[in-house]
């Protein structure tokens, strides 16, 4: 399985993600840059975190209008795997590959801390090494991480099993007081209806080794590699 890690002007988690794939997972990986138009030689495309194009207009808006973004869209339409982390998640919603939008945090502040995530669907390509109800400890770092989707769309996503992670406490209880950004229904990560495109605001690449405080983020990569 060959990975591509996307690099836009302002990306800042690209090397972290590359390191996890190359040195921990020991998989073939290359950087691809914002002017790239051809992703045919890759099996998985990862959009890392950062502040692409300085978050001008709104996070992900300009990145979604690059040649690379069009290539990512075409790649996803072929059923290949696409993962968006933080700013990558924002870009995927701007592209229309994932439902909803990411709005400024409810407190209008940048939030950087460890959070707990509850697995909502263990049957996806990104969670099949996990069990429903498992709790992962993974950090967040964002200003615009408040996931929003209209109520009717949320209902359809629930029915389709598109919600993969929710913010919760250490015991796995989903509560308003542990929601770090005001996301609707405590949502932290979702996938498309087809099941090949996934986005999350927390950073699994920052929870990849015990020395960092957690290796829970590796389970997402291991799930994908078990395909």
Swiss-Prot record:
It comes from the Bacteria. Keywords: ATP-binding, Cytoplasm, Glutamine amidotransferase, Hydrolase, Ligase, Nucleotide-binding, Purine biosynthesis. It catalyses: N(2)-formyl-N(1)-(5-phospho-beta-D-ribosyl)glycinamide + L-glutamine + ATP + H2O = 2-formamido-N(1)-(5-O-phospho-beta-D-ribosyl)acetamidine + L-glutamate + ADP + phosphate + H(+); L-glutamine + H2O = L-glutamate + NH4(+). Pathway: Purine metabolism; IMP biosynthesis via de novo pathway; 5-amino-1-(5-phospho-D-ribosyl)imidazole from N(2)-formyl-N(1)-(5-phospho-D-ribosyl)glycinamide: step 1/2. PROSITE patterns: GATASE_TYPE_1. The keyword Ribosomal protein does not apply. This is Phosphoribosylformylglycinamidine synthase subunit PurQ. It comes from Aquifex aeolicus (strain VF5).
């Amino acid at each position: 399985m060959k990975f591509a890690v996307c690099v836009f002007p302002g990306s800042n988690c690209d090397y972290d993600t590359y390191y996890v794939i190359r040195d921990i997972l020991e998989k073939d990986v290359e950087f691809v840059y914002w002017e790239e138009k051809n992703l045919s030689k890759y099996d998985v495309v990862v959009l890392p975190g950062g502040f692409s194009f300085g978050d001008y207009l709104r996070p992900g808006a300009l990145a979604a209008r690059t040649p690379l973004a069009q290539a990512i869209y075409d790649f996803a339409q072929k059923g290949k795997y696409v993962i968006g982390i933080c700013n990558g998640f924002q870009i995927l919603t701007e592209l229309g590959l994932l439902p909803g939008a990411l709005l400024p945090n409810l407190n209008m502040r940048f939030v950087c801390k460890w959070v707990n995530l509850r697995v909502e669907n263990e049957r996806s390509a990104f969670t099949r090494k996990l069990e429903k109800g498992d709790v992962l400890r993974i950090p967040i770092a964002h200003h615009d991480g408040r996931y929003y989707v209209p109520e009717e769309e949320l209902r359809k996503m629930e029915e389709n099993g598109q919600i993969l992670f929710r913010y919760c406490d250490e015991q796995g209880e989903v509560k308003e007081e542990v929601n770090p950004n005001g996301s609707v229904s405590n949502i932290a990560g979702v996938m498309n209806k087809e099941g090949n495109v996934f986005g999350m605001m927390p950073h699994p690449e920052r929870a990849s080794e015990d020395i960092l405080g957690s290796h829970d983020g590796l389970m997402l990569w291991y799930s994908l590699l078990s395909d």
